[in-house]
Amino acid sequence: MNEHDSSIIENILKKTNLYIITKKPEISDILILNTCSIREKAQEKLFHQLGRWKKLKQKNSKILIAVGGCVAVQEGKKIYKRAKFIDIIFGPQTLHKLPKLLIESNKKKSLIINIKKKSLKKFNYTINKNTNIKKKFSSFVTIMEGCNKYCSFCIVPYTRGKEVSRNNKKIISEIIELSKKGVREITLLGQNVNAYKFSDTFNKKNYSFSDLLYSISEIPRIDRIRFITSHPVEFNNNIIEAYKKIPKLTNFLHLPVQSGSNKILKLMKRGYTIEKYENIVNKIKKIRPKINISSDFIIGFPGETKEDFQKTIYFISKINFDTSYSFIYSKRPRTRASKLEDNVTMEEKKKRLYKVQQKINQQAFQWKRRSTEQIVLVEGISKNNIQELYGRTENNRTVFFEGNPKFIGNFIKLKIISIKYNTFLKGKIISNNYF
């Protein structure tokens, strides 16, 4: 989400025709930091970066420094107390106001804070027919923001606000424009995409997430549809049925389970059991036997015993996850879990995290050995070897292979011939036919 928000910020500033985007802080007049508050480590990175920028501002007092994102909402004026040289604090829902905030900051010469939540106005600045985008063939499209789940470990409802869904027609319009600009693959974004629900008062119809998937599947030249992030509670039969009826939905699903222990899931306030999660996966695998399932895991959650952890390891094997985002539990302010006794030592947390990552890497290795033929969306020329192209498989694996640059932006069939660093794949073109 933050990566996509950063691209929206870039589009907003470009539209003013007042700014040239650069990645070199030393030549910049304005420095913007878009932050994440999911984990404490990410939050501390903010202040490390601000420390580096402070030196630039000491050399040039006219530089404006703006801090946005979820940490901006979470901490507000507290950021200024630790870094009194910053000029603007803005939230994820107010990033569309940034041009005005920059002008105001130049006039006032004092701290400006604008972190109001529950607004979708920033999406007025997404892709349209007049937008120039870099040549790319896969793109993100946000369909909703916020979350109503209030999991005990998660700060998102406090920083992004409650669930708000975009107008389905505006989403479709944005994707149509992306397809006209060469995009072949769409990833739908939201803190809980399954909760998407838009009420069209004019037509007196409610649009669900599955309704949206069917509408997107009808757009020409959009050949792959992905989505993140899903919540098991709202992963209903209509969404499962969509996997049967929409071939464009990739054989890849990111469905966070967080733990393999029902006791821990209850403490996390996740609202489902391991049995319910497994039932969802089994239904999908019955429709799509070759689908790859990815998950999130929080390791060392307060109260997690060795037995709870072993249940997680067992569940990883049972579902056969081949990708995960696994992290050590990070206490976040205002959350219910922050009041629980954190009784797992850091040394033990690190050991458990290593075991989870090793287990999933082993399963990923087995998938790579089995999956000899893949259809790949070719995205460009390798930075490390200009003789090679690179692309991504349905389950989001990067593949490098020798081929003609004319394949870029198209799909081609490859044979996987080797594994590179247990992350990247090496491929060989089966046929020069592309589509």
Curated annotation (Swiss-Prot):
Domain Radical SAM core: 133-366
Subcellular location: Cytoplasm
Amino acids binding [4Fe-4S] cluster: 147, 151, 154
Segments forming domain TRAM: 367-431
Gene Ontology terms for molecular function: 4 iron, 4 sulfur cluster binding; metal ion binding; N6-isopentenyladenosine methylthiotransferase activity
Enzyme class: transferase
Claim: tRNA processing is one of the keywords in the record: yes
Subunit structure: Monomer.
PANTHER family tied to this protein: CDK5 REGULATORY SUBUNIT-ASSOCIATED PROTEIN 1, MITOCHONDRIAL TRNA METHYLTHIOTRANSFERASE CDK5RAP1
Protein name: tRNA-2-methylthio-N(6)-dimethylallyladenosine synthase
Phylogenetic placement of the source organism: Bacteria, Pseudomonadati, Pseudomonadota, Gammaproteobacteria, Enterobacterales
